[in-house]
Amino acid sequence: FAVAGALFEHAFVCIARRGHPGARAGMTIGQFLAARHAVVRQKGRSQEIADRTIDEMGLVRNIGLQSPHFTSLPFLIADSDLISIVPRALGNAFAGFAGLQMMPPPVALPPIPLAQHWAAASEADPATLWLVRLIGELFLGRDPTLRAETDDAE
């Protein structure tokens, strides 16, 4: 495969139900580690970046629930004291329809790079090049909530 380069980077955010005891003024590391976490565990998911970083820091989370899919998280979190770390775009979507609160994680997590890939054999194909350029242009005008900043995550 050839890589066209990074399109953008997602930041991670924490999500919790509105009124979650640790989410009112932002979560401390102690509250974060003590809280029960809902985690998505599936190979190749962006969650591996957050999980690996937290593990490398020597931090141990209280895993209350594991799921192979993000789609169940908002429903599980909305009616519980579970928290989760998700890419910002998912946090925005979940906050909008499930009434969840977003906040910056209390630990520094690297951004999630998103790049487009295509078969090297297609590099000379005009249709492929057109599509690659179109996708790149669309991401230049992307939704600003996909940016890596976390200062407005609350």
Residues covered by each model-derived region:
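Alpha-helical segments flanking ligand/cofactor-binding loops in enzyme cores
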Residues: 5, 30, 74-75
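Secondary-structure junction motif
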Residues: 16, 22-29, 35-57, 124-133, ...
